[in-house]
Amino acid sequence: MPNITVTSLLAMKHKGEKITMLTCYDATFAHTACQAGVEVLLIGDSLGMVLQGHDSTLPVTTAETAYHVACVKRGNQGALILADLPFMANATLEQTFINSTTLMQAGAHMIKVEGAAWLGESIRLLAERGIPVCAHMGLTPQSVNVLGGYKVQGRLEAQARQMRADAIALEQAGAAMILLECVPSELAEEITHAVKIPVIGIGAGSATDGQVLVLHDMLGLSITGRVPKFVKNFMIGQPDIQSAIQAYVSAVKDVSFPAIEHGFSA
């Protein structure tokens, strides 16, 4: 696979070619995902739940994330490496810059931050200094205590209107990509068409420019046994993990995943 860059992802959006993303935390799975054709490897703070066993993403630190970024880098074969900025790692502009720099030096190609229009100043700061940023909107797990749990966001018209405006504002601030989590499919489609940058969805319908899933979820691995509505177990019917990931890539590319039952209505 040729090296995937921010420019590559933008070209894929313009050509209508779906982008595939998976969470990844180590060299072996990075190698396997690349062999299967995954374009973006996300070192998500989801590692706090699926690797460390926490009940939320909040305990994850920048140092822990950087460790896993470095692991993924060693097994990567051309995918773009996207790293989460953990909870409160962007509490101030100075912290945002220092922690983002740490992740980039560990091997990330892009940083993901959770929030809304208020992220504009941070995104502008990073973009102007050569650090590409993905803005994570909708259900933002780091804000789970404010949101009252893991709930669909943007169902009310006022919320939807604000989310559309925020997406445009963050693009104007310099965001290179947007990730929408658990928002109504119709709203996700509107936002995808409203911005020129790639929009990746998880629980956001099939009209976004690409999809992401947590690796453990799509392999049917769970400590709790609770499976989010937007997840499909791609291990079913497959002989090995690489085949399962290839099935995921193919399903995203031909838009057979996500199906209607994996999305949410307004």
Curated annotation (Swiss-Prot):
Q: Which residues are listed for 3-methyl-2-oxobutanoate binding in this entry? A: D45, S46, D84, K112
Q: Which GO terms describe its molecular function?
A: 3-methyl-2-oxobutanoate hydroxymethyltransferase activity; magnesium ion binding
The Gene Ontology CC terms held by the record are:
cytoplasm
Broad enzyme group: transferase
Q: Name one Pfam family in it.
A: Pantoate_transf
So what does this thing catalyse? 3-methyl-2-oxobutanoate + (6R)-5,10-methylene-5,6,7,8-tetrahydrofolate + H2O = 2-dehydropantoate + (6S)-5,6,7,8-tetrahydrofolate
* SUPFAM superfamilies named among the record's database cross-references: Phosphoenolpyruvate/pyruvate domain
Q: Which UniProt keywords apply?
A: Cytoplasm, Magnesium, Metal-binding, Pantothenate biosynthesis, Transferase
Give the protein's cofactors.
Answer: Mg(2+)
EC number of this enzyme: 2.1.2.11
What is one process in the GO biological process aspect for this record?
Answer: pantothenate biosynthetic process
What is the first-listed, main subcellular location in coarse terms?
cytoplasm
The pathway to which it is assigned is: Cofactor biosynthesis; (R)-pantothenate biosynthesis; (R)-pantoate from 3-methyl-2-oxobutanoate: step 1/2
Q: Where in the cell is it found?
A: Cytoplasm
What HAMAP family has UniProt attached to this entry? PanB
Q: What does this protein do?
A: Catalyzes the reversible reaction in which hydroxymethyl group from 5,10-methylenetetrahydrofolate is transferred onto alpha-ketoisovalerate to form ketopantoate.
Give the family from UniProt: Belongs to the PanB family.
Q: How does it assemble?
A: Homodecamer; pentamer of dimers.
Name this polypeptide is given: 3-methyl-2-oxobutanoate hydroxymethyltransferase
Organism from which the protein derives: Pseudomonas syringae pv. tomato (strain ATCC BAA-871 / DC3000)
